[in-house]
């Protein structure tokens, strides 16, 4: 290597390259790691040095050289690259490796307008000194490379135009804790700040993108998911689109319920004009969703819901596919088709499904969610009423069209609206669940708005986080984590701003939370269980029982302290009904684990003191934040031992946790023979989870004769999911052979899923 090369320092001075210094930094970064070679990294980077190279470019070249060596055989390069990246990041943020004192850092950031000035109003310099003593900056060294790149790209406070970075990860964690507990009494709050900081900085609790990137800054909107219901009037349609724009601009993912909009050709003003139908209004919503790019943190994305029996359903099911012309396609949203038992019964009996415009059949649309018996009574009555416009379709043809579109696009989702209302924390008579969200894990009541400031409408918000099952040794640890997660997210509801009155009203009235899990695949591998063979059924029952029990207990304790949520009377919990009372009894045939906790005592305490939060759990996808915690995604099996994620910061390689010890224990996605085992596990989880689950179906065409997945198989899995009480189905993944080769040159590529990464964590 040429020792006479000149390098340009960060301050503009030039000097000769100091290879010893580079070697020392690499030695430091490699300390304690297995199977990594410093000289290999040096060789790969030296050939890219040139005369006049900036020291920052040298650093980036070395980081990239180390990251390129991450493989199944040498997973520790992900930590070598991460340490080098942390070193570089701190130099950029602080001009040196050692972070400054927390108080001085906060003062400077508030002056620059990067942090919310309430931090200095809420806490004294003395309290900041105490918080500084809680910080363990060495925890930065436990990040994987993919995690550091996620932090840099999405989470750390920065100037997205110039690329300047202003903080390091431990400051992010301590300040999120400080903001969330700022309204707690002085005598207890620092204790909560420390406990919460420890839980998030050791990856036991995983936080969603809006909280990680937003709490501590002047922007105060952190709900990942927003659910907006549209009425059947122009005013309501315009109010819906205004609400979409407001929330898309503030980092949220959108669920739109457009099922009430009348069908093409319906009379308007008593026949003075006829209606243009759903598609022009769906296009209007699509434009609203795509209007904001959210400052590089995420692009806008939405899932739009409609009932299977809508008169226009055959035109709506094909909106996402690549055939057709611009005029009859709306491709940049995803769609959720709403189904209930009557539709499935017609399919099984070889019957017809009758399609109506919701505007022609009084009471039918509301009964579809609120009362299944009443829905069936009205539906059959309207089928026999010759004065009502309708169309009959063979059930098998309609279901086949839906499943064909689901298979070809992967993004036609399913919502079983009867399960969403019969196994629900809400009383469907007063608070029916009429839609889900972008990623299908949220099930909350909504009401249409007539204008954007309508006080009587209700926009549902959900605030998410997750427990990292890979970071706990026993289920008992969930008790403390549940206390911290519930208290932090509940405090967030009061801390954040609400751009629309209907959203504030619902959030303050219901105080809904959605706490889920990440790293489930690692949890199974650690316990020697598999997805596909039933061996994980009892463990899953035990795990999710503990999660829901401790979450309810934490919310009940909080209610004793701060009062139940104002609309607690609209929940089934208020009547003493718990998820263990309303689950689908078909599950008893596939799991024989008994209940382990004192639900009876909890039931009495909830009836007496209430809950601070109407909902507590939801199982969301977690591609992004599971990278920060070096965990597997949500409840999903990994596609490969090494996954490659294409992000705007380049290609990121991530190796499954504890690969060297557990490589034979993991069950990879495409090793599963079918969806049965996975759908059983989702059903068992849904027994306890009070909202819903982003559950996927997966197909490998090469397993079937003629290399094509038979329609019969798709319908069988749909019915299996329904049988086990599954509320929603999210993606359908089809193996194309390219994405999951297991050699190190072609590890599995993970796409960003819902384009925005909202509603996931």
Question: What kind of region is each of these model predictions?
Answer:
Residues 44-45, 63-65, 79-87, 199, ...:
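A glycine-rich phosphate-binding loop feature that marks nucleotide/adenosyl-phosphate handling sites
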Residues 77-113, 149, 339-341, 420-451, ...:
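Terminal amphipathic helices with adjacent charged low-complexity linkers/tails
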Residues 124-151, 440-446, 489, 493-494, ...:
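Catalytic alpha/beta core of large soluble enzyme barrels
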Residues 157, 164, 171-189, 193, ...:
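Function-dense linear segments that define catalytic or interfacial modules
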Residues 199, 482-504, 508, 529-622, ...:
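Internal maturation/activation junctions in enzymes
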């Amino acid at each position: 290597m040429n020792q006479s090369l000149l390098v340009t320092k960060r301050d503009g001075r030039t000097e000769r390259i100091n290879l010893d210094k580079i070697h020392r930094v690499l030695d430091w970064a490699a300390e304690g790691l297995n199977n990594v070679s410093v000289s290999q990294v040096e060789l790969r980077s030296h050939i890219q040095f040139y005369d006049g190279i900036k020291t920052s470019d040298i650093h980036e070249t070395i980081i990239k050289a180390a990251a390129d060596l991450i493989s199944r055989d040498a997973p520790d390069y992900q930590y070598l690259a991460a340490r080098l990246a942390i070193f570089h990041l701190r130099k950029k943020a602080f001009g040196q490796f050692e972070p400054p004192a927390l108080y001085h850092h906060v003062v400077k950031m508030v002056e620059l307008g990067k942090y919310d000035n309430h931090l200095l109003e809420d806490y004294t310099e003395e309290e900041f000194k105490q918080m500084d003593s809680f910080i363990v900056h060495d925890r930065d060294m436990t990040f994987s490379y993919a995690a550091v790149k996620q932090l840099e790209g999405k989470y750390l406070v920065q100037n997205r135009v110039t690329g300047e970075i202003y903080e390091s990860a431990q400051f992010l964690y301590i300040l999120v804790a400080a903001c969330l507990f700022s309204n707690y009494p002085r005598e207890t709050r620092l204790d909560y700040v420390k406990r919460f900081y420890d839980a998030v900085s050791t990856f036991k609790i995983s936080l969603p993108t809006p909280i990680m990137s937003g709490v501590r800054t002047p922007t105060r909107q952190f709900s990942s998911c927003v659910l907006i219901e549209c009425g059947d009037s122009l005013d309501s349609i315009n109010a819906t689109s205004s609400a979409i724009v407001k929330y898309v601009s503030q980092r949220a993912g959108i669920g739109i319920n457009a099922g009430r909009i009348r069908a093409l050709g319906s009379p308007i003003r008593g026949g003075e004009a006829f209606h243009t139908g759903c598609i022009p209004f769906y296009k209007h919503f699509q434009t609203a969703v795509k209007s904001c790019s959210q400052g590089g943190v995420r692009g806008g994305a939405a899932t739009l819901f409609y009932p299977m029996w809508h008169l226009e359903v055959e035109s709506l099911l094909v909106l996402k596919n690549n055939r057709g012309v611009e005029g009859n396609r709306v491709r940049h949203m995803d769609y959720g088709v709403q189904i209930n038992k009557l539709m499935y019964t017609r399919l099984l009996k070889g019957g017809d499904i009758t399609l109506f415009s919701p505007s022609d059949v009084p009471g039918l649309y509301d009964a579809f969610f609120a009362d299944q018996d009443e829905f069936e009574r009205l539906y059959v009555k309207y089928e026999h009423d010759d004065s009502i416009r309708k169309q009959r379709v063979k059930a098998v043809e309609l279901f086949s069209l839906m499943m064909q579109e689901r298979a070809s696009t992967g993004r036609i989702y399913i919502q079983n609206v009867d399960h969403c209302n019969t196994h629900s924390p809400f009383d469907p008579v007063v608070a029916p669940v009429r839609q889900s969200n972008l990623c299908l894990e949220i099930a909350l009541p909504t009401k249409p708005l007539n204008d954007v400031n309508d006080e009587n409408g209700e926009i549902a918000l959900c605030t998410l986080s997750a427990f990292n099952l890979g970071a706990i040794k026993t289920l008992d640890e969930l008790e403390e984590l549940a206390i911290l997660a519930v208290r932090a997210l509940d405090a967030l509801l009061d801390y954040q701003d609400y751009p629309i009155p209907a959203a504030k009203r619902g959030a303050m009235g219901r105080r809904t939370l959605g706490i889920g899990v990440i790293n489930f695949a690692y949890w199974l591998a650690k316990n020697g269980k598999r997805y596909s063979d039933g061996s994980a059924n009892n463990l899953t029952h035990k795990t999710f029982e503990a999660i829901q029990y401790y979450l309810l207990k934490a919310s009940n304790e909080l209610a004793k302290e701060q009062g139940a949520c104002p609309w607690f009377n609209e929940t089934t919990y208020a009547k003493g009904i718990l998820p263990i009372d309303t689950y689908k009894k078909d599950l008893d045939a596939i799991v024989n684990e008994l209940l382990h906790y004192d639900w009876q005592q909890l039931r009495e305490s909830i009836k007496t003191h209430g809950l601070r939060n109407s909902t507590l759990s939801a199982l969301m996808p977690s591609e992004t934040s599971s990278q920060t915690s070096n965990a597997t995604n949500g409840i999903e099996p990994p596609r490969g031992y090494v996954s490659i994620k294409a992000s705007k910061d380049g290609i990121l390689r991530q190796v499954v946790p504890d690969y060297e010890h557990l490589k034979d224990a993991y069950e990879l996605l495409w090793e599963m023979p079918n969806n049965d085992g996975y759908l059983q596990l989702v059903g068992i989880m849904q027994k306890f989870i009070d909202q819903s689950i982003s559950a996927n179906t997966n197909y490998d065409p090469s397993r079937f004769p003629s290399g094509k997945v038979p329609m019969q198989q798709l319908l069988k899995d749909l019915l299996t999911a329904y049988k086990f009480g599954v509320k929603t189905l999210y993606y359908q993944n089809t193996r194309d052979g390219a994405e999951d080769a297991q050699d190190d040159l072609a590890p599995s590529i993970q796409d960003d899923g819902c384009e925005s990464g909202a509603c996931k964590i």
